[in-house]
Each structure stands twice: as C-alpha cells, then as structure tokens.
C-alpha cells in the first residue's frame, strides 16, 4: 500500500483536468484502496496550504483515476484552476492496514540492520520505480545503500522497534 504522510495527512494523488462542465475533476489516485475512499471520504485537503474541501461525490472512472466533485467547485473554470494540485486526506480516513501493510512514513527513519544484527544505517527514503520500491539507506562514511523492497532482501519491518531487517546477498551493500 502506498501512502505518503505529512502532519497526519496522507497524500493520495493529484488533481488533473476538469471532467465535464459542472466542476468535476479527475483525481489521479495512488491509493491501494480506492473503494474505501469512494465509500467513506467526506473531506480532502488540497494544495500546499492543505485547504479543506468537502467532497460531494467521488467515483471510479477507471483504475487509478477517480472523479471527484467538491462542494465549492461548480464549474469547469474553477475545476481547471485546481489542476496539478496535490490531494491529501486525514490519516483517520484511510483504509485500515492489513497485517503485512505499512505506511512509508513508518519505515523512513528506521534503523536498518542485517539479519545477523550488523548495523547498516538509517532508512532515508523509499523510491518508486516501474519495477517496484527501493529502500534508500544512509550509511556513515559510505554511499547510500539501495535495497529492493522484496521479501528476498527485506525479511522484517518492525514498526514498534523501528527496525528494518535485511538479508543481504554478496555485493548488495558494497
């Protein structure tokens, strides 16, 4: 599941072009659970100032693309003014996480260690590539380590202990 958190708000996507003439807007969503948003979402926070807007309608147009109607946006011109703006929701409005899911912000800042207990460094970022996610680990006096986020390498993510356990293969951390 992909979510980016800022001050108890989760980034869920960006607004695109208007959809129709009555103020509906395309929402390019990164949510893994759009059906939860469609059923439960009532408020979104838009733009760098996180301006709250009440949602009057939200539905799936096609995978990854939702159509959103905001109560205060009633025409195509007003909808066009929001094109490109980032959309956030309150963390409490997100779908509950499954046992094997986590928020990216829970991982960033974790201590990375090998499965034998050797300290690697601190998780600085998670990059998304077309093939999957890459964990960026900052190491003292060495270049960052880039570790694919796959079960072969990431053997445990302990949110409570703030530890990411890696099973390195030869050359992975060199």
Curated annotation (Swiss-Prot):
Its localization reads:
Cytoplasm
User: What UniProt keywords apply to this chain's record, in alphabetical order?
Assistant: Chaperone, Cytoplasm, Ribosome biogenesis, rRNA processing
The UniProt GO MF terms for this protein read: ribosome binding
- Residues in PRC barrel domain copies: 99-172
How is this protein annotated for GO cellular component? cytosol; ribosome
Gene Ontology biological-process entries: maturation of SSU-rRNA
Where does the protein principally reside?
Answer: cytoplasm
Q: Which HAMAP family match?
A: Ribosome_mat_RimM
Q: Which family does it belong to?
A: Belongs to the RimM family.
**PANTHER family found in the cross-reference section:** RIBOSOME MATURATION FACTOR RIMM
Q: What is this protein's function?
A: An accessory protein needed during the final step in the assembly of 30S ribosomal subunit, possibly for assembly of the head region. Essential for efficient processing of 16S rRNA. May be needed both before and after RbfA during the maturation of 16S rRNA. It has affinity for free ribosomal 30S subunits but not for 70S ribosomes.
On assembly, the entry states:
Binds ribosomal protein uS19.
Domain observations: The PRC barrel domain binds ribosomal protein uS19.
Its protein name is Ribosome maturation factor RimM
- In which organism is this protein found? Chloroflexus aurantiacus (strain ATCC 29366 / DSM 635 / J-10-fl)
């Amino acid at each position: 599941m992909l979510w980016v958190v800022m001050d108890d708000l989760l980034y869920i996507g960006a607004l695109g072009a208007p959809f129709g003439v009555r103020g509906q807007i395309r929402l390019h969503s990164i949510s893994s659970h759009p059906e939860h948003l469609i059923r439960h979402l009532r408020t979104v926070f838009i733009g760098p100032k996180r301006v709250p807007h009440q949602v009057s309608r939200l539905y799936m147009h096609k995978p990854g693309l939702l159509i959103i109607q905001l109560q205060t946006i009633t025409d195509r011109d007003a909808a066009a003014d929001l094109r490109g703006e980032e959309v956030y929701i309150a963390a409490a409005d997100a779908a509950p996480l499954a046992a094997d899911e986590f928020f990216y912000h829970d991982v960033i800042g974790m201590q990375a260690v090998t499965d034998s207990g050797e300290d690697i460094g601190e998780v600085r970022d998670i990059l998304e590539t077309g093939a999957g996610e890459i964990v960026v680990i900052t190491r003292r006096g060495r270049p960052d380590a880039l570790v694919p986020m796959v079960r072969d390498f990431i053997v445990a993510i302990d949110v409570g202990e703030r530890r990411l356990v890696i099973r390195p293969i030869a050359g992975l951390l060199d």
